[in-house]
């Protein structure tokens, strides 16, 4: 029986940066494809999640919750979601891992008469381990045997990949109690999972135990609702007549924060990844992107503008422009400090939105001052630096707000980079944005007596502006 009524979606955000980055794009994709109601997306944060990231989801309009850790405190935290949703009005809830992204509406696939989950990709754990667990749990009757999604082995019906579960309201209370009960039991009886290297599958195996021990109705979901791309394999549960609705990418991201799979995949998979990347690109946000970049890809850090030849070029340019002679310097968007860390600057304040970048910067120059804030006040300096910040401002309002801040805090000279014109490469890059020629923006402020181009690299120009 197809689902009707109100569907809500829920996922857990933990303290690690990846939860916020993936969760941000997952939440946006659910809002875009699954009804347009931000309040139907429930973000459940563990206690350690920084307030900045809670505010990010709150600004999006999501419903926010805090949940305590459960069991091992790592892989089983999702089990506390159902209890925290107990007072919410809904007809069914979809529990998701954050490393998924919606490409289409999930709701037409859902049912009111059964819990849905997609059978495991491969035999994790093996059938023999499930048999051993079932015997120890005194399971009265084994479930039916079925094939894994890749057809690599047999497993039991209900042994599902944990990235997607759909649960009708009528079964939530029972499943919540039984799932947690069997997870605690399994954590005390881990040997079959430990022996097969499947300790991280406690959540999915305890789900399997819970639905069968409690006699809850279950139906296997099509692979359209939990489509893996992290390895090449058959998707035997795919409904070929319908689109892929939910990708489970398992952190297959590149340095640009986009999905990346090896070449040679099927046209269906390549098209799905393209749609996923369009979704991610449309949701570019400086706060989540740069935290992901500095923590996930520290070798790339601030980007090509602060590495290799460009790094040496900008460092020499700063020396020529007198940065070491300035009484004090304000660096807006200082990043990981690769360009300036070796310069003899006397009084330096670096500002950035990424706590990970500032950790690197503080380690490099503990004698300098660093501040985590997007819009600080009262930081005027004789020389202000702003390299490759304006090009990442998604909206014109954000672009002009940065310029206004730079103008307000420049006592002597501003060195700033940006675009002089639009181009196809800019239009095709979801990370960068053109609003107008930078020189036009600077002259419009009326603040500077002299504006001159003093450099250029990659596809940006650098201006010196003197008050």
Identify the role of each PLM range.
Residues 1-73, 88-89, 418:
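N-terminal anchoring/stem segment of glycosyltransferases
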Residues 2-4, 151-156, 173-282:
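A glycosyltransferase accessory/donor-loop signature
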Residues 68-104, 108, 116-119, 206, ...:
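A conserved donor-nucleotide-binding helix/loop in the catalytic core
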Residues 104-135:
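Conserved donor-nucleotide/metal-binding helix-loop-beta segment in metal-dependent transferases, i.e.
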Residues 149-166, 171:
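A conserved mid-domain beta-alpha-beta active-site/ligand-binding segment of alpha/beta enzyme cores
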Residues 281-377, 396-401, 405, 412-467:
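Class I (Rossmann-like) S-adenosyl-L-methionine-dependent methyltransferase catalytic domain
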Residues 388-392:
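Short catalytic micro-motifs in class I SAM-dependent methyltransferases
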């Amino acid at each position: 029986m197809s689902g009707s009524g109100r569907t809500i979606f829920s996922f857990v955000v933990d303290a690690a940066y990846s939860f916020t980055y993936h969760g941000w794009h997952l939440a946006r994709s659910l809002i875009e494809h699954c009804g347009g109601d931000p309040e139907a997306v429930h973000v459940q944060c563990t206690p350690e999640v920084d307030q900045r990231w809670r505010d990010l989801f709150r600004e999006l309009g999501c419903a926010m919750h805090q949940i305590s850790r459960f069991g091992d405190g790592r892989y089983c935290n999702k089990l506390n979601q159902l209890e925290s949703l107990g007072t919410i009005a809904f007809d069914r809830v979809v529990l998701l891992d954050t490393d998924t992204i919606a490409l289409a509406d999930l709701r037409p696939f859902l049912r009111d008469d059964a819990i849905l989950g997609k059978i495991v990709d491969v035999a994790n754990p093996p059938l023999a381990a499930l048999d051993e667990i079932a015997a120890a749990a005194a399971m009265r009757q084994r479930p039916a045997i079925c094939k894994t999604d890749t057809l690599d082995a047999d497993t039991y019906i209900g042994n599902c990949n944990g990235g997607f579960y759909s649960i009708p309201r009528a079964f939530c209370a029972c499943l919540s109690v039984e799932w947690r009960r069997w997870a605690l039991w399994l954590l005390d009886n881990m040997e079959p999972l430990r022996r097969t290297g499947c300790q991280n599958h406690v959540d999915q195996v305890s789900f399997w135990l819970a639905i069968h021990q409690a006699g809850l109705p279950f139906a296997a979901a099509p692979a359209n609702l939990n489509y893996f791309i992290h390895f090449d394999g058959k998707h035997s549960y795919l409904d070929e007549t319908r689109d892929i609705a939910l990708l489970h990418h398992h952190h297959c991201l590149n340095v640009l924060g986009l999905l990346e799979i090896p070449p040679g995949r099927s046209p269906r998979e390549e098209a799905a990844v393209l749609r996923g990347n369009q979704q991610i690109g449309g949701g570019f946000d400086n706060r989540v992107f740069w935290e992901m970049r500095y923590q996930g890809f520290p070798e790339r850090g601030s980007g090509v503008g602060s590495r290799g030849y460009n790094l040496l070029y900008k460092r020499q340019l700063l020396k020529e422009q007198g940065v070491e002679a300035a009484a004090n310097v304000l660096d807006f968007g200082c990043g990981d400090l690769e360009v300036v860390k070796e310069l003899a600057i006397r009084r330096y304040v670096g500002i950035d939105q990424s706590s990970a970048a500032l950790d690197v910067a503080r380690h490099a120059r503990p004698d300098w001052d660093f501040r985590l804030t997007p819009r600080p006040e009262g930081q005027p300096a004789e020389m202000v630096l702003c390299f490759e910040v304006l090009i990442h401002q998604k909206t014109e309002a954000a672009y002009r707000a940065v310029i206004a801040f730079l103008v307000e805090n420049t006592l002597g000279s501003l060195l700033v980079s940006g675009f002089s014109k639009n181009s196809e490469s800019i239009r095709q890059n979801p990370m960068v944005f053109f609003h107008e020629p930078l020189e036009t923006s600077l002259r419009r402020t009326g603040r500077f007596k002299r504006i001159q181009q003093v450099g250029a690299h990659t596809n940006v120009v650098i201006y010196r502006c003197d008050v």
